Amino acid sequence: MKRFLLACILITLASPSWATKIPSGSKYDSRIQYVDYNSGDVVLVRALPGVGARIVFAPGENIEDVASGFTQGWEFKASHNILYLKARSMTLSHSNQSIDMAPEPGKWDTNLMVTTDQRMYDFDLRLMPGRNNQRVAYRVQFRYPAAAAAAAVAAAQKRVVQARMNARPSPVNWNYTMQVGTNSASIAPTLAYDDGRFTYLRFPNNRDFPAAFLVAEDKSESIVNSHIDPSAPDILVLHRVAKQMVLRLGNKVIGIYNESFNPDGVPARDGTTVPGVKRVIKSPGENLQ
């Protein structure tokens, strides 16, 4: 007896497990149904004779291929991310006679396989009896909790990176002096510092920003790219750290001198001087994560 029970248990454990995923009905109407996507699930779709149904996939997803084990008895029409389906009559030829067969519950059940440009789906199609059967589906709509969670994580990471990029950097050098040219005090900055990568100049409110020029050892000048700090519109950010720069606006001129100039600047160990942000170079076509 014990051997028999053990054999039954082993057979049960070795048997395949079939568990069709049944969509849940809307609280407003049970015929509007929802199901979470899982690539390992087979989803049950219950239909009625003479009544169409539709399966709705993710927005932006496009159906590429539809296959079924009983295409003679079912009609399928794909439109972007929606698949319309309906059981249909079929005609059989026997002894030179044509016999029309209407869809019949229990005999029209089959499987359905859908391939989109993003995922693969498997279904059991079941034709149900009774016109008022509340278990049938007019619409089966997929939800994607894993994709939504991944998108939320990616969005949160993007916000963190953007916040770090927008954050005001920590100054590493305040040791700046300046020489004010004749009648040039109106374009003189009130504050100067650098973070080892960029130079930051603060100006009184409502003043025009001067153009900045890098002064080379041979005293030649070249323009320096700059932008206004979005979090502090009175600060002009120069995209260089240099020993000497010149500010010009019309005939006005200011000399800016970095008295603690470090030609090596701040080492960018992660490809960027922004704390917590790492620069990653990927090959063409490689997805960014």
From Swiss-Prot:
Transcription of the operon is maximal in early exponential phase. The VirB system could be required for the establishment of the replication niche in the host. The lineage of its organism: Bacteria, Pseudomonadati, Pseudomonadota, Alphaproteobacteria, Hyphomicrobiales. Induction: Specifically induced within macrophages by phagosome acidification. Induced at 37 degrees Celsius in minimal medium, suggesting that nutritional stress is a regulating signal. The keyword Signal applies. CDD domains: VirB9_CagX_TrbG. InterPro entries: Conjugal_tfr_TrbG/VirB9/CagX (IPR010258), VirB9 (IPR014148), VirB9/CagX/TrbG_C (IPR033645), VirB9/CagX/TrbG_C_sf (IPR038161). The keyword Signal applies. It comes from Brucella suis biovar 1 (strain 1330). NCBIfam families: VirB9 (TIGR02781). Belongs to the TrbG/VirB9 family. This is Type IV secretion system protein virB9. Residues 1-19 form the signal peptide. Gene3D superfamilies: 2.60.40.2500. The gene is virB9. Keywords: Signal, Virulence.
